[in-house]
């Protein structure tokens, strides 16, 4: 077995400490061809003899540009040359928005995780990505869940606890480290030219805003934002756990609805988490902050009071001691 570098050992330590992966697992690697995903794939391959993993690779071509399609062809050839089991998916129709592209990409990951019977989907997000996500979500407006959303692991489908785990073994590394690793190992990284397009707000944040903040406010900005995300993650997990304990006391599935008295007596943070969980069950999509707050207001409202209409023709109405969802 080849000797492991300090970077390999750091990633292996994170895998063990965070309990991300287990020996003998079948892994699906989300592979863009950029430096982070190349670094991830190489480290997993180097650790494979010690862990006995079976590694499968998926690349998604969004067809946003001719360059992206050329990248897909190049990566497919390289993966074939390496003898790695892989698939390349091409978007049809093309999803022009980030949210639509992400949803399509996750659909492909779910499909291939099932096809190859993979229990973990491994992604190459780094601490640099986590810092950017924290600041991006803060600027857009979000709570603790959004600020700490890029975590070490989560379910591929957050509504399905049986879905594969998304794991991020590189969250302890920064982007400059993955770049250095790829250079040292002469990996054929494909540069994503769209990452330089300042028309995309996320690119402007990464290329202009964060360097400015580092220069004028905090040279260790990425580390500071990662610490904040870690702290908020632990606090959010506490609220979620306490809300889970309260849930059987307030949820009435037959209605469906919530008992107002015990929920009204709970702290506001728990009220919001329970309301978010309830609305996520009855609505077609996760609720917004305003939709959660509309439900919270009804906990103290008079009988017969109702919320504004929610998506899908749903609304909440006070019926006695219950807050009931109608459709």
UniProtKB/Swiss-Prot annotation:
The keyword rRNA processing does not apply. The lineage of its organism: Bacteria, Bacillati, Cyanobacteriota, Cyanophyceae, Synechococcales. ATP binds at residues 32-37. One of its GO terms (biological process) is tRNA modification. It catalyses: cytidine(34) in tRNA(Ile2) + L-lysine + ATP = lysidine(34) in tRNA(Ile2) + AMP + diphosphate + H(+). Keywords: ATP-binding, Cytoplasm, Ligase, Nucleotide-binding, tRNA processing. The gene is tilS. This is tRNA(Ile)-lysidine synthase. GO terms for molecular function: ATP binding; tRNA(Ile)-lysidine synthase activity. It comes from the Bacteria. Ligates lysine onto the cytidine present at position 34 of the AUA codon-specific tRNA(Ile) that contains the anticodon CAU, in an ATP-dependent manner. Cytidine is converted to lysidine, thus changing the amino acid specificity of the tRNA from methionine to isoleucine. The N-terminal region contains the highly conserved SGGXDS motif, predicted to be a P-loop motif involved in ATP binding. The keyword tRNA processing applies. Signal peptide: none annotated. One of its GO terms (cellular component) is cytoplasm. InterPro entries: Rossmann-like_a/b/a_fold (IPR014729), TilS/TtcA_N (IPR011063), tRNA_Ile_lys_synt (IPR012094), tRNA_Ile_lys_synt_N (IPR012795). It is found in: Cytoplasm. Pfam families: ATP_bind_3 (PF01171). Its EC number is 6.3.4.19. Belongs to the tRNA(Ile)-lysidine synthase family.
